[in-house]
Design a protein with these regions (language model features):
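Extracytosolic ligand-binding ectodomains
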Residues: 2-5, 21, 32-410
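N-terminal secretory signal peptides that target proteins for export/translocation
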Residues: 1-13
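Bacterial N-terminal signal peptides
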Residues: 18-30
């Protein structure tokens, strides 16, 4: 038996041996560093393309895609094409964890890009940190994101959530007494981004003597805002500061209009930055005078902005909202980190490079503190004549503030 087996092993046809050898060579070549470095750079993300946060999530997808398209048209990243792998987390924290685990272990992406909102980026960034992968995210500025000692996390906006409305609150607090609101209301979505921002503004306004007459926190899946609108009507505040995303921001304005609630001043987070989509959702005639913090405007003279805006208009026949611009800027930051490190393998080198350098983006020049939080500030925008104008701080304003919210074409 042994002799026969030996003879059989020695008597394999030469053609089979040649085929086996050729197959092994191909496998080794495919697994070689040279082959991997010639292929596309795979960048993975999971976004809320469905569910409660789908509106900004789909805009973030557009922003990433426009960035990748322009990069590839200009020679790629380190001379290699960029390939996006995008999953849908359905606005769910458990799903986003599964998605990022799959991107790392199954899809074997070279780089990660963040998802949308602090709610989803909190668990997603923990997956990246555990795997020592750079995690640059476009929309997750809650202070909770940056008190965990992470080394690979970076936020691609100008400032943290709790700083987003500070310029507006300071402006209100410093108005002449006869022009300053006497009372304020603070409805807010239960969200790690919105609540710190509202709390910071409330602290400034209360210190200025503006009395709180109403406050409410509602669940992320709230659809009916009639009860809150009724509470606002009964309390009759001069100022409403609303911590919101897109869907609830739209729903709140509609409910306020139905209940005939019209504060002298209205500040909303999130929703007004969606541009034309916001205007169409609440009615263009109802936007006049609404304040909000701004990360991007289409006419900004910032790095790559003209190319981004033009390509977005060509592809989608619309003005790009800031959610798309924030994702595009995330791509710019990832690109700068890769070029700074000179490769896509050394994720620590990329993170170290970002801590030591600033990056020019469509949002302006961004730089970071040691914990990955940005160290800039947000300008404040106001809807005027159907368009967004930067109004605060005054030295950089495009237009003076117009007094009051004027819904219904007043």
């Amino acid at each position: 038996m042994n002799t026969t087996a030996t003879v059989q092993r020695r008597s394999w046809p030469r053609t089979r041996l040649a085929a086996l050898f050729a197959t092994l060579c191909l496998l080794l070549a495919a697994c070689s560093p040279a082959a991997a470095e010639d292929g596309p750079i795979k960048i993975g993300t999971s976004l809320p393309l469905t569910g409660q946060i789908s509106q900004p999530g789909n805009e973030a997808k557009r922003g990433y895609e426009v960035w990748a398209e322009l990069v590839n048209e200009n020679g790629g990243l380190l001379g290699r094409p960029v390939q996006l792998i995008i999953k849908d987390d359905a606005s769910d924290q458990n799903t986003v964890v599964s998605d990022y685990n799959a991107l790392i272990s199954s899809d074997r992406v070279d780089l990660l890009a963040g998802t949308y909102t602090s709610l989803l980026n909190l668990p997603a960034s923990a997956i990246a940190e555990r795997n020592k992968k750079l995690f640059v995210e476009p929309a997750g500025g809650s202070p909770q994101m940056f008190n965990r000692g992470f080394r690979y996390l970076f936020f691609t906006q100008q400032a943290m959530a709790d700083q987003s409305g500070v310029a507006f609150a300071n402006w209100v607090a410093n108005l002449p007494p006869d022009q300053r609101p006497k009372t304020a209301a603070y409805p807010s979505i239960d969200d790690p981004f919105a609540e710190p921002a509202v709390a910071a503004m409330r602290g400034i306004l209360e210190q200025a003597g503006i009395q709180t007459v109403y406050e409410s926190t509602y669940a992320i899946d709230t659809r009916n805002f009639d009860t809150i609108a009724a509470g606002l009507k009964n309390s009759n505040p001069d100022l409403v500061v609303h911590g919101a995303g897109f869907e609830d921001g739209v729903g709140m304005v509609r409910a306020m209009r139905t209940a005939n609630v019209q504060p002298k001043l209205l500040y909303q987070m999130g929703a007004p930055g969606m541009g034309e989509q916001y205007a169409q959702a609440i009615g263009p005639e109802n936007t006049e005078g609404i304040f909000f913090s701004v990360s991007h405007t289409p006419d900004a003279a910032t790095s790559g902005n003209a190319e981004f805006v033009n390509r977005y208009r060509q592809k989608y026949n619309a003005e790009p909202p800031e959610d798309a611009a924030e994702a595009f800027a995330t791509g710019q930051v990832i690109q700068a980190a890769v070029q700074g490190a000179g490769n896509v393998k050394d994720q620590t080198a990329m993170a170290d490079w970002l801590r030591q350098n600033s990056v020019e983006t469509v949002l302006g020049k961004l730089s970071w503190n040691d914990n990955g939080s940005p160290n800039g500030s947000f300008p404040i925008g106001q809807w005027q004549g159907g368009k967004v104008k930067l109004v605060l701080p005054e030295p950089t304003a495009q237009s003076p503030v117009i007094p009051g919210w004027r819904p219904g074409g007043q």
